[in-house]
Amino acid sequence: MTDTNELFEDQTTALQNSAPIAPLANPQHTVSRGKFRSLTLINWNGFFARTFDLDELVTTLSGGNGAGKSTTMAGFVTALIPDLTLLNFRNTTEAGSTSSSRDKGLYGKLKAGVCYAVLESLNSRGQRVITGVRLQQVAGRDKKVDIRSFSLQNVPMSDSIISVLTEQVGEKARVLPLADLKDKFDGSEVVFKQYHSITDYHSFMFDLGVIPKRLRSSADRSKFYKLIEASLYGGISSVITKSLRDYLLPENTGVRQAFQDMESALRENRMTLEAIKVTQSDRDMFKRLITESTNYVSADYMRNANERRGNVQIALEQRRAWYESKSKLELEQQRLIEFSREVADISENESSLEAEYNSANDHLNLVMNALRHQEKIERYQDEVAELNEKLEEQQIALEEVSEQVETAQARADDADDQVEELRSQMADYQQALDAQQTRALQYQQAIAALEKAKQLCGLPHLDLHNVEDYHAEFAAQADDLTDQVFELEQRLSVSDMAKTQFEKAYELVCKISGEIDRSEAWDEARSLLTAFTDQKMQATQAVALRQKLADLEQRLHQQQNAERLLAEFNQKAQTQFETAEELEGYFEQQQARLEDVEAELAEFVEVRSTQRQQREQLNQQYNQLAKTAPAWHTAQSALARLEEQCGEKFEASQSVMQFMQNMLTKEREATLARDKLARREAALDAQITRLSQPDGSDDVRLNQLAERFGGVLLSELYDDVSIDDAPYFSALYGEARHAIVVRDLESVKSQLEKLDDCPTDLYLIEGDPSAFDDAVFTAEELAEGVVVKVSDRQWRYSKFPEVPLFGRAAREKHLETLKAERDEVSEQHAERAFDVQKCQRLHQHLSQFVGTHLSLAFQPNPEEQMQEIAAERTEIERELNQAAGNEQQLRSQLDSAKAKLQMLNKILPLVSLLEDETLADRAEECRAQLDEAEEDEQFVRQFGNYLTQLEPIAASLKSDPAKFEQLEQDYRQAKAEQKQVQQKVFALSDVIQRRVHFSYEEAIGSEGSALTEQLRTRLENAQREREQARDQLRQAQAQFTQYNQVLTGLRSSCDAKTQMLQELIREIDDLGVRGDIGAEERARSRRDELQQRLSQQRSRKGYLDKQLGTIEAEIDNLTRTLRKAERDYHTQRELVVQAKVSWCLVLKLSRNSDVEKRLNRRELAYQSAEELRSISDKALGALRTAVADNEYLRDSLRASEDSRKPENKVAFFIAVYQHLRERIRQDIIKTDDPIDAIEQMEIELSRLTNELTSREKKLAISAESVANILRKTIQREQNRILQLNQGLQNIAFGQVKGVRLVVNIRDTHAILLNALSNGREEHKDLFDSQKLSFSEALAMLYKRVNPHIEMGQRTPQTIGEELLDYRNYLDLEVETFRGADGWMRAESSALSTGEAIGTGMSILLMVVQSWEEESRRMRAKDILPSRLLFLDEAARLDATSINTLFELCERLDMQLLIAAPENISPERGTTYKLVRKITNNQEYVHVVGLKGFGQQ
């Protein structure tokens, strides 16, 4: 970029040092420049009505201080720029004042009333243009001025401005207000127009060539005012010099606007994409809103419908329950009466039965006690008999032992006597120590024995001779006594036995008959024994009698049971049967009835089973249909939705498939039309893009070649031509319209051979790009084209092109046409794309419908089938209920028949007993016989043993053994005599044994020792025998004692048991019952039977009591249930009525608002209330979030939460629908249904997303193209600045010999341009980012390549927009050539006042000229604008400087209005002498106009 600056300086120097290049041809037509003709001030301070005619060059206002020069210039400036925000006349403003400066110096220059400042000008067309302002002071402290701008056209030249604005009233003139002025010209050719905006006023002045630039905004007016202000007060204005770029460099609105349009389009595109995303989210929110609101309301709607249906069903069920409770209550009351009657009967029977049971139980106890007593008696009898036997045995043993004791005692006594005798003999024998002594002792003993015998026997004459005789006599006598003793002993034994037998028999008789006299014992025993035989025979018959009685009692009991059963049967069967024939006939009848009932019941059961199977099948079908119904309703909703979307009525699945095929065909056709329109739109976009280029060229290589050759495209030189001239110039150059204008063809010729890539035909024209003229060809303009004479032999005819390459205005005009066409094509493309999207969506819906719902959508309505099934099921239920009642009756009949048959089965086997009337008598007779037999049996059992014992010894009772003591005494006496005789025999035997000893009378002395020894031996033997006898005695005594003790124990035990036996016999006699095994069994069976009957009665009574309690409780419950059922029914009925009112309101709302089909979602009818409430609650939670920002919907939703008013939910749904309807854009979406709108919105948003994405790709601009545009624009403006510098040549003010403009590219921006051109890949991250706009990316790149620069608080977008303006890339400075300093920067401090004023005026002229060039393409080609500048206080310029200004004005065809003191008199131009005078207390300015009164 430094090379560019150096090149610019070289070009500038060359231009200044070289002569100007002559144009290739002189223009054939010239346009005169417009001029300001006059300035008229009406009712200004000092000027009531004054017109200043303005010179074509310089108009000078000369006068002293206060003469009115500044007021005149203020009037001119006010008429030129009527903007109170800018006007500020400083030389009349109080210094340092704040409040008094509010009028900006204008208020004090006016007089009260209507004031005018009017400019009259003559434009290039020769039109008289009158523009001005009406001013009027506004009363108040603020010193405000009201300004109204206006214009007048077609005013004749003969009419002066003052005559137009005033009217003659007598000798005075009146200033016309604007309204009167307007009325004055109504209906005439004069066009009066009042402007309500300064922009319109300035647009009028620009169009007619009054001002050089179109002032579109307040910023443009500010620039213009600052330029006028700078020229007014003179000098180098720092405001202008600091912003020369804004004044001299055109804004290049086309490029900038293109960038801005591109950026705004991209931004709008992205914003639209974001808005689409937001809209999609809003759509999703709306979709969710409509979905959730539908779920919320429809779930509650269906729940209320279900609840209403359920409430009606509940009401019917409660009414049915009420009636059933009433019938149950009546039935239970009937049962209570029957059960109470039966309980009363059972209570009556229970007492008698209980008495019988107690009696039977007591009888059983007596029998059991009797049996126990009998067992004890038998046991005791056995024990007593055994004890008697033992006692007898013991008695015999005791007697034997007694005899043994006596024998042992006798033997012991004999042994003692013998020992004593032997001891005595021993003592005697011991006295003789020899045999003699012993014999003598024996002799003495023999003598002693003889004496003893004599003494014992009483035989004094006893001797050895008669001893044997006496011995024999006494032995015989002893034998007789022994026999007598034996006899007596036998008699005694017999007597003892007789006594024992008598005592025993007597005891037995006493035991049997009680205590009787001993003398009567025999008679009693005999009578007992006589009766005992019969009693034993009767006792043997007791068993048979007992068996017989048991049989009779059993039969009697069976007869009683049969009578009882018959009575019960007759009572239950309501009959009076008595005979067996009647019972058997009835039995056969009931058996046949049972078979019939069983057959009928089996048939009922079979029919019921069949009906239950049918009901089960129907239930299965119903459940299957109930499962299918929601899906079917969903399919129907989808089908209805699909029919609405397609606008078709589908009758079958084939029609859906056919429509789907047709939709595919339609989609292909729409796709082809869309693609065709897309290609047309792309072609138009390409043409628009080409025409949007600054040079209008469609070949990029031409720009590259122009830069390479240092030339300019011909189209750029004619870029500012007007719309009317553009076709002419395009046709004039023909194919050469793409030519490149270069300064020297020869210098370019050498480069042509080196070209690698260039167009097929490349046209080069030699000429100065800065002063190019169109007089190149000899041409003649025709109606439709131009005939160009290329040479004498070659003409070319070119028609006016419809789209001229030359002229930006023409291209822009055609661009408008192309854009309009593109918009139309884009709209058509959008419609076709919408149609394609719609077709695709419809095909998608169709595919989804076919895949999901086609199998169910055209099937029959499952609810109708469900209703039919429900009707069949109800009929079956009714039949089943009826069959259940019939079956219950049959079962009751069956149970009754079975019960009767069961009772008959019990009665019939006993029916023969009912006719046996003698059974009771026979039983009584048998019982009497059994009683006798049992008494005999009991007597035999009790006394049979005694009688058996008594029978063999009964004879002992004949005599009473009372002489037993005498016999015993005789026996003892005989025994004593026998003992004495035996002693005598023994003594005699001892004498006989000692008879030999009598012969020892001689040997008494010689046989003593032998005898002693013999005696000692005998004594020892005797002692041993005595010890043995004593031992035997002791043993016999011990045995006797033992036997006696045993006998005593047996006797006491026998007495005790006998006593116990007597007590048991008395007790069993007291019981009066004879027990046997059969009796116990009979008593027990009787007791058990009665117990069973009593238990049955009690259990039946307990059951009946429980049933009565249950029935009473059931009656109470049924009574409460009946009341509750009645109350619930009435409550439910009221609820149904209330719900019906609310439901009617809901239906009315939904039907009137056409939302019923949205709410009546039958697929929800099969869900439970909890599931529907869950759906509604979930939707409510989502809706609270969705409508949180919408107060109306939020309030409506809050009101809808009241469960008591379901209509509020419908109202909320209607509000949601209305809310969504209001937000449907009818220009885009052609429907009132929000759901359809959402569907269409999805299609449209999808299409817009695709379209905007592709548009963003088209709108994207490369950084390299931006750099090329900026470089090209900078180069063009540099060339223009060079051209402007030519107009400042030979300007001299004092020491200043030249003024020029220097334009340089800033280094930081040059680096940016290089980065844009060459760093494409390096900085790709910035320009390819979707988050950054191009301006922001450009600002980020600027910061990246210039990291040392602080951006401050400005945003990247602002910096980027500034970087898109080429003016920010350039630095403009004013340099002056002054003396020896050479070229230096123009500053007021380095110049004198005159030099500064001249230099500043030169700069201003350059600015005005630049504005004219900039606005040339916007102005008609036959108009050149007026040029006028001001200069107040020109006294600071010398005469030479003033002459220089005159020359400058003459050369640049410019007017100048200056104010000078009285001593300044320009040589040329018009001079007005202003003198302020006072006449008659009225102040006015006296004006005298002169022309060229200065020195020659």
Curated annotation (Swiss-Prot):
This protein's record includes keyword Cell division: yes
Feature: compositional bias, Basic and acidic residues: 1082-1091
Residues reported to bind ATP: 63-70
Region of interest (Flexible hinge), residue spans: 694-811
Coiled coil: 328-493, 536-632, 861-1171, 1235-1291
Segments of this protein annotated with the region Disordered: 1082-1101
Biological process (GO), any one: DNA replication
Gene Ontology molecular function terms on file: ATP binding; DNA binding
Pfam families noted in UniProt: MukB, MukB_hinge, SbcC_Walker_B
Principal location: cytoplasm
Domain of life: Bacteria
A GO cellular-component term linked to this record: nucleoid
Keyword Transmembrane helix recorded: no
Compartment annotation: Cytoplasm, Nucleoid
Comment, domains: The hinge domain, which separates the large intramolecular coiled coil regions, allows the homodimerization, forming a V-shaped homodimer.
NCBIfam families: PRK04863.1
PANTHER family according to UniProt: CHROMOSOME PARTITION PROTEIN MUKB, DUF4476 DOMAIN-CONTAINING PROTEIN
Function description: Plays a central role in chromosome condensation, segregation and cell cycle progression. Functions as a homodimer, which is essential for chromosome partition. Involved in negative DNA supercoiling in vivo, and by this means organize and compact chromosomes. May achieve or facilitate chromosome segregation by condensation DNA from both sides of a centrally located replisome during cell division.
Name assigned to this protein: Chromosome partition protein MukB
Gene: mukB
